[in-house]
Amino acid sequence: MRSFEFFEHTADVGIRAYGKSLEEAFSNAALGVFEIITDTSKVKPIEYREIYLNGYDLENLLYKWIEELLYYYDSELMVFSKFDLMIDQDSMTLEGKAWGEKFNGKIHERRTVVKAMTYHQLSIEKTENCYLITFVVDI
């Protein structure tokens, strides 16, 4: 199973992320966002940021997850390539670590800046075999 793919969207970028678990799908959604920013295969998981979030539903939790990661990119130039997280659907909380390193222009390719997560076309579906997350980011 592929981890994520991009789809056409006027002036923005759409992402479809897949995972056998909800946590894997959220991780792959984040990986897709950072793949827009740089080549994540060159991002070493050297340091991490702990993340604790709560939401009112899964879509809101995903929105906050991506926004939190983009906050670290905007404020610290952190780019991420590995994610360890747990999602509790009863309390609608996410707890985890995002692993990566500070962006270094000598190592990391500068691609497109992701400005923000959006609610446009945001959906989280559970199929028989996997979770599918669809969303659009503003570039």
UniProtKB/Swiss-Prot annotation:
Read off the InterPro entries from this record: Archease, Archease_arc, Archease_dom, Archease_dom_sf
A GO MF annotation of the entry reads: calcium ion binding
Write out the GO biological process terms: tRNA splicing, via endonucleolytic cleavage and ligation
Please tell me whether the keyword Metal-binding is annotated for this protein: yes
User: Any keyword Transmembrane helix?
Assistant: no
Q: Which Gene3D superfamilies match?
A: Archease domain (3.55.10.10)
Q: Which Pfam families match?
A: Archease
Q: Where does Ca(2+) bind?
A: 12, 138-139
What HAMAP family does the database record attribute to this sequence? Archease_arch (MF_01222)
Query: What is the role of the protein in this entry?
Result: Activates the tRNA-splicing ligase complex by facilitating the enzymatic turnover of catalytic subunit RtcB. Acts by promoting the guanylylation of RtcB, a key intermediate step in tRNA ligation. Can also alter the NTP specificity of RtcB such that ATP, dGTP or ITP is used efficiently.
This protein is called Protein archease
